[in-house]
Design a protein with these regions (language model features):
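N-terminal post-signal-peptidase region of extra-cytosolic proteins
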Residues: 28-43, 67-72
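N-terminal low-complexity, Pro/Thr/Ser-rich intrinsically disordered segments
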Residues: 1-3
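Sequence context surrounding c-type heme c attachment/ligation sites in exported
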Residues: 5-15, 19, 23, 44, ...
Length: 152
């Protein structure tokens, strides 16, 4: 059920789905990890049951005027960890979601940077991922990830 996924203690040892995703519009940097099960996903078939994604949301560091700082590499400079979001998939997990907010068999959880449960309802996650439909397995940057995998 939504909200029941715990933050895996070892997720920082997992492969990165995508690293340093830049969100200048939100002044955020995101690190997205995927468990070893998720690495077995395919562009044609999506991600298998047992897949878990962990997304760390960092505030970008800002200057005195509130402008996001950019490093020598041209990327936003990571500041404090704001939130940790989880997305997990297993057979039947998504059935408890309200009608109109079902994202296949995915469930969601959100935590504050300090590890406490976040107040955001999972409906916000579901609403955001909804447009990605089954063809993208409700996962953002699906094509970007599989394009990166194919080019290796």
């Amino acid at each position: 059920k939504d909200g029941e996924l715990a933050i895996p203690a070892d997720y920082k040892t997992w492969p990165k789905f995508l690293s340093e995703v830049q969100r200048p519009d939100a002044k955020q940097v995101r690190e997205i990890y995927m468990n070893p099960v998720a690495t077995q996903g395919t562009q044609a078939g999506g991600f298998p049951n047992g897949s878990v994604f962990v997304m760390e949301n960092y505030a970008a560091k800002v200057d005195a005027d509130g402008k996001a700082l950019v490093g020598a590499d041209g990327k936003l400079v990571k500041g404090n960890l704001l939130r940790v979001f989880l997305m997990g998939k297993n057979e039947g997990w998504g059935q408890s979601a309200p009608e109109g907010l079902k994202n296949g068999d995915w469930i969601y959880a959100a935590y504050l940077g300090n590890g406490d449960k976040a107040p955001e309802p999972a409906a916000a996650c579901r609403t955001c991922h909804m447009p990605l439909t089954q063809s993208k397995d409700f996962v953002y940057r699906y094509d970007e990830y599989f394009g990166k995998v194919a080019s290796k």
